[in-house]
Amino acid sequence: MSEALKILNNIRTLRAQARECTLETLEEMLEKLEVVVNERREEESAAAAEVEERTRKLQQYREMLIADGIDPNELLNSMAAAKSGTKAKRAARPAKYSYVDENGETKTWTGQGRTPAVIKKAMEEQDKQLEDFLIKE
């Protein structure tokens, strides 16, 4: 809450501040505050009316489903079953580079993600190029 709102919300502080204003100024502020409060009330009632209308429509659709012999839970379950299909997995990328690690094992790398430390070290210290590690077909 801002300092101005804290002042407006505290009756003692508000009285102290009001002593410094004329009655005309206080009445003008009151009119403006009433306008703001009325606007807020209208917004709140409009939002409540929207919620009520939505609830009414949902109830109407539910009654229509029941009249047609369809259980709403059955409809929800069928929608969930249709939606819950697993995401298609993408194919693994083929290896593009081959290298020998510190343990003497031959490993491969697709070229995606971080460069393996062995390749990085060879490129920095031994002046090798990435093309030197390409898998030849």
Swiss-Prot record:
Protein name: DNA-binding protein H-NS
Gene source species: Salmonella paratyphi A (strain ATCC 9150 / SARB42)
Entry's localization field: Cytoplasm, Nucleoid
Gene field: hns
Organism lineage: Bacteria, Pseudomonadati, Pseudomonadota, Gammaproteobacteria, Enterobacterales
GO MF annotation terms: bent DNA binding; DNA-binding transcription repressor activity; minor groove of adenine-thymine-rich DNA binding; protein dimerization activity; structural constituent of chromatin; transcription cis-regulatory region binding
Pfam family, one: Histone_HNS
InterPro entries found in the cross-reference section: H-NS-like_N, H-NS_C_dom, H-NS_C_dom_sf, Histone_HNS, Histone_HNS_N
NCBIfam families noted in UniProt: PRK10947.1
Annotated function: A DNA-binding protein implicated in transcriptional repression and chromosome organization and compaction. Binds nucleation sites in AT-rich DNA and bridges them, forming higher-order nucleoprotein complexes and condensing the chromosome. As many horizontally transferred genes are AT-rich, it plays a central role in silencing foreign genes. A subset of genes are repressed by H-NS in association with other proteins.
